[in-house]
Amino acid sequence: VDAGQPAETATTPSRKKRGPKRKDPPGTPKNKAQRNFTDPDSRIMKNSDKAFIQAYNAQAIVDGESQVIIAADLTNKASDVTHLPDMVKQVESNLDRKPRELSADAGYFSEKNVTFLEKRKIAAYIPPDKQKHSASVEPPPRGRIPANLSCKDRMRRKLRTVRGRKTYALRKQIVEPVFGQVKTVQGVRQFLLRSKLK
């Protein structure tokens, strides 16, 4: 230790400043990324138990009167929001007509989807937010619809109307029994074939 310098600075070696951390180029898989060699079309998705599994995302539209599946698809994209337009087009193709109204859960809400349905003159009942079972029920809106409402706020308002509540409440009575029938009675809880093609 040099007598002319304080002890802490005398023992600290000088370091060069380092540059920014190296970044991997876009599209580079993470170090722990894995690939499924038996079914490369499938993707890792979160299931209803919040566990991550190798899976596909099954889509279905059910007719409200007959409780028959009128459109179905299997995708490897976890998010539901991008599938709504293709599913509606499939209904139109299968039935040779368009539906009058459509109810879906919050996973399908986007301004793009609502606009798509409005252009086709299909009444949409899709909550922009996940519905909480314990949420207090707000009174139905009164008066004219304010012109400056966002798409989300217009949909929230529509779902608070008497017709909106009634229509959206039927969604579970229409769709869930069909899924229950497929899973429980027919025993279809998983797909036994590999790849989207099959």
Language-model region placement:
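Anion-binding and metal-coordination hotspots
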Residues: 1-198
